[in-house]
Structure formats: C-alpha cells, structure tokens
Amino acid sequence: MLKGHLHSVESLGTVDGPGLRYILFTQGCLLRCLYCHNPDTWKISEPSREVTVDEMVNEILPYKPYFDASGGGVTVSGGEPLLQMPFLEKLFAELKENGVHTCLDTSAGCANDTKAFQRHFEELQKHTDLILLDIKHIDNDKHIRLTGKPNTHILNFARKLSDMKQPVWIRHVLVPGYSDDKDDLIKLGEFINSLDNVEKFEILPYHQLGVHKWKTLGIAYELEDVEAPDDEAVKAAYRYVNFKGKIPVEL
C-alpha cells in the first residue's frame, strides 16, 4: 500500500500559503542548506510516521470549515515533497475531490528532466492550486556553497512552471553575508520578473530557531555567528529584487 513518509504536521498554520492551512512536513531532502531549521527531515528513511492517503484525508477534512472561512487549505512542505510524488498525486486528487485548496512548498532540489519525474510532476500539477518555490540563490556557485547542490535544474523548473502557467509564489531566505548581495538580488529580481506566473514574492529573514536540532544531531552549525537581518536590510532586499516594481505595503 502506498504510504507517505512524514516528519510532522501542523494543524492550523498561517505562513505557508493563503488562509489557515493544514501543513504536512514530509521526510527526505537532497539539499543541505547551511541554515536549515529542520535537518532532522533530511533522511527519507527515518520518518516519524508513515501514513496512507485515506488516513491523511480523514485527519484533514475536519478542518475544512476553517479552510473555507479563511480561504485556506492544505500545504505539503518538507523536507522536499517532490521526493514523494506518487503519494502526493493521490493525496491531492482526493483533497481536490473534497473541495480543498492544495499547495506545494518546494525547493525543487530533486527536479530533473527524466521521463519519470516529468510524468509524475505533470500528474501532480493537475491537482495543485499553488506552488511556493524557494529559490535559495541565483548564482550557481554561491548556491552550491549554501545548499551543497547547483541551481541550474531549479531555475529550469521555475521556467517550466511559468510555461505551464502554474500559479507560484517565490520565496528567498535572506542570510547576511550569503544571500544578501545587492547584485545577486538584482539578478534574482530580473529572473523572477521574466516569469509570467509569479503572483507573489516573499523574503524570509534568516533565523536560528533550528540550531538546537543541529546540536542534537551532532552536526556542526556553520552559521552560528550570523545574526538575523534587520528591517532595513529586508527593505533594501525587496527594493533590489524589485518584484513587479513594488515592495510589500507593510514595509
């Protein structure tokens, strides 16, 4: 029986997509981001829970009144959810049959041009209302330094989503000294503005809320001395990216 490997769930999240959302955090990720706040999700073979589609749908549907009242739904995050597309295809299809908005939060670290990946993703996309795409860095060498992997396939995936006219929000973690260079942010903005499907751009300020997990796992945390960016740095980053010529009104 097809099962999903989960790390955890959050019943009423408010930051990973519109409205109130039930969030599934999947187990497994190919990236090794220096600032990852969930390093315990990296190994796909070590889930805290295995679930069937029916089990998950039965847990989610009691929250539908909250989704309907707030314009919310279900977001699958990670880890990297695209590592478990056969499970997500079935889950999202069932959720859509029940009138639930579906959202995928991905870094696309496992995206590739194989027929198998393309076939599964095209099926999943049929049942996906929104994708939150995390672009860690626009510069390939700096992306490797930050995540351990190149970004060429990730940018190609972003272009494919644009060709598919899939609604997307793009997010970028602002890490002082690593992903806050003015020229890089300008290039990031030029790339994002070249896509036709991006509805929203968000900067996520770096934080150290997950450092204790690195210590628990016995992994050295390289960014121990990096402080969170201040409000002015965040505002400057929005200006450099210049998404559709505007910055969020709350700034």
From Swiss-Prot:
The lineage of its organism: Bacteria, Bacillati, Bacillota, Bacilli, Bacillales. Binds 1 [4Fe-4S] cluster. The cluster is coordinated with 3 cysteines and an exchangeable S-adenosyl-L-methionine. [4Fe-4S] cluster binds at C29, C33, C36. It holds the Pfam family Radical_SAM. Activation of pyruvate formate-lyase under anaerobic conditions by generation of an organic free radical, using S-adenosylmethionine and reduced flavodoxin as cosubstrates to produce 5'-deoxy-adenosine. It comes from Staphylococcus aureus (strain NCTC 8325 / PS 47). This is Pyruvate formate-lyase-activating enzyme. One of its GO terms (biological process) is glucose metabolic process. GO terms for cellular component: cytoplasm.
